[in-house]
Amino acid sequence: MKKVFVVGQQKWYSEWIEDHVIADNLEEADIVMFTGGEDVDPSLYGCEKHPTTYSNIARDLEEKAVFEKVRSDQLCVGVCRGSQFLCVMNGGLLIQNVSNHATFGTHQIIRADRDSERYEITSTHHQMQYPFNLRKNVDYRVLYYASRRSEFYEGVVAPPSCEPEIVLYTVADKPVCLAIQGHPEMMRAEAPVIAMLNNLIDQLC
């Protein structure tokens, strides 16, 4: 039984994880979950704020303090804003404005090493992870991506080579963060993407 500590106590974000209980504190958790909400403040990744960015620096700093206490035997999982936050904490940047992703419906994500494997997942975001050329000693792997849905990529110098949807961050080949851009908590329990994500988490922790 996995113990999940939901940062900020928005416990419904973890409901899609099978066979889990809510941890009351960080120390006892197997999984530390960072959830959705406001945009991450660009000051955390050294950029100027785009006019469309709405951030809460107090929340960012509180969650940064939690992230810095996470042990090497714990897995961080980020959902939507949480995925972007984990990108930043691992030295990445954010694309501050994209189109055709804040649909409040679903869109398709594609497995990076097997493009015949595709899933539908709920999408509500206007920002996006930019894990390319990480500034820290962290490696990343884009596990799933979206086919260039956006008409523009505002807030970065170069467009992304793909639109990252699920990114795994590792340190010395050890998984440390699983960043999920979509909203699995908004999907039906029987949706294929839920089984895929649970299988992935089982492999990582």
Language model features: what each stretch is:
Residues 1-79, 88-95, 99-126, 130-173, ...:
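N-terminal beta1-alpha1 cap of cysteine-dependent amidohydrolase-like domains
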Residues 83:
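Catalytic nucleophile loop
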